[in-house]
Amino acid sequence: MNINRVTSIYYSPTGTSGKIAEAVAEAFAASMNGGRSFRQISSAAGAPLETDVLDITLGGRRLQVNDSFAVIAAPVYGGRVAPTAAERIRMLKSEGSPCAVVAVYGNRDYDDALIELADLCRECGFLPLAAASFIGEHSYSTEEFPIAQERPDSLDLEKCAMFGSQLAAVCEELQQRLSQAGQDEKSVIMAELKLDIKGNRPYREYKPSPATPQTDINRCVLCGRCIDMCPVGCIEMKTFGNEEGLEEDMAIESDPAICTKCCACVKGCPFGARIFNTPYSEMLHRNCSARKEPQWSMAL
């Protein structure tokens, strides 16, 4: 089991999954590098563990991931792995690279998402050694109805560092055991790697909402940033005739058949022109305000 680098792989429309994955990967690399960051030892003697980032938010690509420890993170939508994340993770292939799977949810529950993510990574050829659930600000969180607002926060990032350090210890222990074992013993060691993950098979049914973010034309300046940040390309700048029929007006619209309600456009619009009014915001604020904490399990 060769580990020459640590790669954070994530689908992260609103930035929370990416922030968590990179923090875990950084802590893992620092621990494997003797407590120093890659930058601190990049000019020193020896071969430091390299760090890579594979952000699949705006598009996936077929890629072989080998000789790497991967931190694979995805958001939870309706108790499942975000469908677009699942599609893009399936494009990755590995020949037994160890990984940690991380489900990021908005303080309600991750339901079957974590076990689904672990299954998905196994199908791609990865070897999950750890599974974690972390909390990120809910996509439906608003100023009026905050849900896990500004998470991951400093306490969450401390947990990321703790998780990353523990991952490094698990990898080092496994590498040591494998290096001292014969071929038959290695097979036994690998067969004994089991993860205790909450969730059900078959997974719960995913039920997407038909609603989609709208545009406040009084605030929108037609800058097109929402178009650029949409992970599924569902936002367009459309032209239509005005009331007099003499000129053409332009407006930003989403295709509800494609929109995944990730709310990247809502949170990313610098003018507050993208709005998603859903009764779930108030419901989640009312019922899911008690702070939940990250949890994880290890295969060793």
Regions found by a protein language model. Name each.
Residues 1-20, 26-54, 59-210, 277-300:
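FMN-binding flavodoxin-like domain, especially the glycine-rich phosphate-binding loop
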Residues 215, 225-253, 264-281:
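Iron-sulfur cluster-binding cysteine motifs and their immediate structural context
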Residues 104, 218, 240:
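Histidine- and/or cysteine-centered catalytic micro-motif in compact active-site loops
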